């Protein structure tokens, strides 16, 4: 059986890409370095701002950049792709139509894990970009898992969240 090669479609921000690689490495049971999973990362910080695209309706440049980066991973041999950017998941359906490699839905997996950890009917706090909130990605995924999403109730809190998320990362 050949090994599965993981692709990381990253750069949004670069530290998130590095953090995912570290987490994959730390969670892989390995007695020697050869036991680790093969991971290919394309950290492309030139992908346009996802929140701006969602709020302005100019989504095609983001879709094109995500697809180009995913195709790079596909050509490099990735057999599954992960995207360590919540807001980029608003473009997941479009991206899946443009590449053959399966792409993990981080939002869906988060909702499944929340249900497993806290049980159906639980309330889940949600801090996210304006774009992620507007698309209701997490709200819908959590509702499908019979959970309730609650985001910031005051604009000042959401502004503070955005200030934090907009820092260089």
Question: What kind of feature is each model-predicted range?
Answer:
Residues 1-169:
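Non-catalytic structural scaffold of enzyme domains
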